[in-house]
């Protein structure tokens, strides 16, 4: 039996199984040991079953796949060769695990006889991602003693675990050489595949799992709790779940606190600012019940409120993950937000607390005055909605600007906002944004800090393949300005935290053949944005700001509002 042919047979079953689990995108890094998997992915692409994407940097590739999976809400497969290529996927795997994004990670491996004996490019790959995958599938090297039915069943069991929990399935696949010289005809006619002939021409799983949909029932004490003083807090949510929360909370007369990731239009905007007011915060803590939809809040003030609240606490979140870092004694509903709302009709009543609305109105005027008309981080955050396309998506990086956007920006209802707030790292942000563009096939606005951009420069190569207008805003405040918030000596802060780079991104844009613009005023920016939307390509828009302007304004807003005296 030809080893190279059977390697392909083994890979064929793996890839065909994943396609039947919803995979339509395969992200591939170059490498020799992964050749059997790569060639089968190419065959599936030629058959119209998948789209293959390539990238030379495995770390970026992992985040690119993450972005596609976020945008399509479907699992994505990743193929890499053996050795440290596999380890470079770790950051993306961590982020996927934290946020329940489904990835199938296929790591080619040397065969067991080459482990721990000094063989080239052989590292210990079994279970190498620890507890971060929802399932680790450590396959033997291809062997006809194992039936194809066994291989399918093993993979589908792992896929079922993924559907239940959300996250990564790691499939480690050792291959013995030779890896080449197998023709499609030799593979398709191999006797090992004969029991699968009917399955191979059908687009259905080997094991049919009937998942029972649990109906969301009204809480037995809802008639009691809906008469009380409540606060609705909304974190990161899929766009389709955001609809209706605002009107439901308004009908109840309850205070609504929203995260920029929620897709919910706030009734009292600028929560991250006005929650700094101690008088209002103390009144808010007198609520009888808090109902939280989603999780992973950006706002420090919302997090502080949640931590301080000691009353009745309900959490509505579909993933089943533990998403209460303050360990409330709570009632948990594993449900989608809109399903829960249907089961819990509102009781129409007047607002129980008027100060948030009054303070929010004061903030609107005060913030406009403080931000001014110059092109700065704060003005970009405040006026970001004017730059967004009607049918587009927004990706926010993990820098000072994401806090400013969360504090100052008001987006249209259910406008798609993507972030990497599982581990909130600065790695892979460009790659994730590129993946979201490919996966959504919509215009993208990505707003990323300069340090984050430097950390992921290789991923600019991924934007060559975008087919929709893509605007990459790089906020260049000469280093990690978010660290200005720390109570650290200025000299120490520069040397060990901010790390000024004193550079710009014009030559980087040229290197990756990207359109580049460096607007100085809002008039310049509006012109640049108009031109960028006329092209189905990526444009790098560098916004240079003074290092401390954004953080200073943010701190000033918080300080001024914290002492404001507002009558209801």
Swiss-Prot record:
SUPFAM superfamilies: Thiamin diphosphate-binding fold (THDP-binding) (SSF52518). Pathway: Quinol/quinone metabolism; 1,4-dihydroxy-2-naphthoate biosynthesis; 1,4-dihydroxy-2-naphthoate from chorismate: step 2/7; Quinol/quinone metabolism; menaquinone biosynthesis. The keyword Transmembrane does not apply. Pfam families: TPP_enzyme_C (PF02775), TPP_enzyme_M_2 (PF16582), TPP_enzyme_N (PF02776). It is an enzyme of class 2 (transferase). One of its GO terms (biological process) is menaquinone biosynthetic process. Its EC number is 2.2.1.9. It catalyses: isochorismate + 2-oxoglutarate + H(+) = 5-enolpyruvoyl-6-hydroxy-2-succinyl-cyclohex-3-ene-1-carboxylate + CO2. Binds 1 thiamine pyrophosphate per subunit. Catalyzes the thiamine diphosphate-dependent decarboxylation of 2-oxoglutarate and the subsequent addition of the resulting succinic semialdehyde-thiamine pyrophosphate anion to isochorismate to yield 2-succinyl-5-enolpyruvyl-6-hydroxy-3-cyclohexene-1-carboxylate (SEPHCHC). NCBIfam families: menD. Homodimer. This is 2-succinyl-5-enolpyruvyl-6-hydroxy-3-cyclohexene-1-carboxylate synthase. It comes from Haemophilus influenzae (strain 86-028NP).
């Amino acid at each position: 039996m030809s080893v190279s042919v059977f390697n392909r047979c083994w890979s064929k079953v793996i890839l065909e199984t994943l396609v039947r689990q919803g995979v339509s995108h395969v992200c591939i890094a170059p490498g020799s040991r992964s050749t059997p998997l790569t060639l089968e992915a190419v065959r599936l692409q030629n058959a119209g079953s998948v789209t293959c994407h390539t990238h030379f940097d495995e770390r970026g590739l992992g985040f690119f796949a993450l972005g596609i999976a976020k945008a399509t809400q479907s699992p994505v497969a990743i193929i890499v060769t053996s050795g440290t290529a596999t380890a470079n996927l770790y950051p993306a795997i961590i982020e996927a695990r934290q946020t329940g994004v489904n990835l199938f990670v296929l790591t080619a491996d040397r065969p067991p006889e080459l482990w721990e004996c000094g063989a080239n490019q052989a590292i210990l790959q079994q279970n190498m991602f620890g507890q971060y995958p929802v399932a680790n599938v450590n396959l033997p090297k291809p062997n006809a003693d194992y039936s194809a039915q066994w291989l399918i069943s093993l993979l589908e069991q792992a896929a079922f675990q993924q559907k239940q929990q959300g996250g990564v399935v790691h499939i480690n696949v050792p291959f013995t050489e030779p890896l080449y010289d197998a023709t499609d005809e030799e593979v398709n006619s191999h006797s090992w595949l004969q029991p699968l002939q009917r399955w191979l021409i059908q687009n259905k799983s080997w094991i049919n799992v009937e998942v029972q949909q649990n109906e969301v029932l009204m809480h037995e004490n809802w008639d009691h709790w809906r008469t009380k003083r409540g606060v609705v807090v909304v974190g990161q949510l899929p766009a389709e779940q955001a609809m209706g929360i605002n009107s439901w909370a308004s009908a109840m007369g309850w205070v609504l606190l929203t995260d920029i990731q929620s897709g919910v239009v706030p009734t009292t905007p600028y929560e991250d600012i006005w929650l700094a007011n101690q008088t209002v915060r103390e009144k808010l803590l007198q609520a009888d019940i808090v109902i939280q939809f989603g999780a992973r809040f950006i706002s420090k003030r919302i997090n502080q409120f949640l931590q301080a609240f000691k009353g009745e606490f309900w959490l509505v979140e579909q993933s089943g993950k533990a998403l209460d870092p303050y360990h409330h004694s709570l009632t948990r509903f594993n449900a989608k937000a809109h399903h829960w709302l249907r089961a819990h009709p509102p009781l129409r009543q007047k607002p129980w607390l008027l100060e948030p609305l009054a303070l929010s109105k004061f903030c609107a005027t005060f913030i406009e005055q403080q931000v001014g008309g110059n092109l700065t981080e704060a003005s970009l955050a405040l006026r970001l909605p004017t730059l967004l396309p009607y049918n587009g998506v927004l990706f926010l990086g993990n820098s000072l600007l994401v806090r400013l956007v969360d504090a100052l920006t008001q987006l249209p209802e259910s406008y798609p906002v993507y972030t990497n707030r599982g581990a909130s790292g600065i790695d892979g942000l460009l790659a994730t944004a590129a993946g979201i563009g490919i996966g959504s096939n919509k215009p993208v606005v990505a707003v990323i800090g300069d340090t984050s951009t430097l950390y992921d420069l290789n991923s600019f190569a991924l934007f060559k393949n975008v087919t929709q207008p893509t605007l990459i805003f790089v906020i260049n405040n000469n280093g990690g300005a978010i660290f200005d918030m720390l109570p650290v000596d200025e000299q120490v802060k520069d040397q060990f935290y901010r790390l000024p780079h004193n550079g710009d991104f014009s030559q980087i844009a040229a290197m990756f053949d990207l359109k580049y613009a460096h607007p100085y005023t809002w008039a310049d920016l509006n012109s640049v944005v108009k031109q960028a939307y006329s092209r189905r390509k990526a444009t790098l828009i560098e916004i240079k700001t003074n290092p401390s302007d954004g953080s200073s304004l943010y701190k000033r807003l918080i300080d001024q509002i914290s002492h404001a005296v507002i009558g209801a």
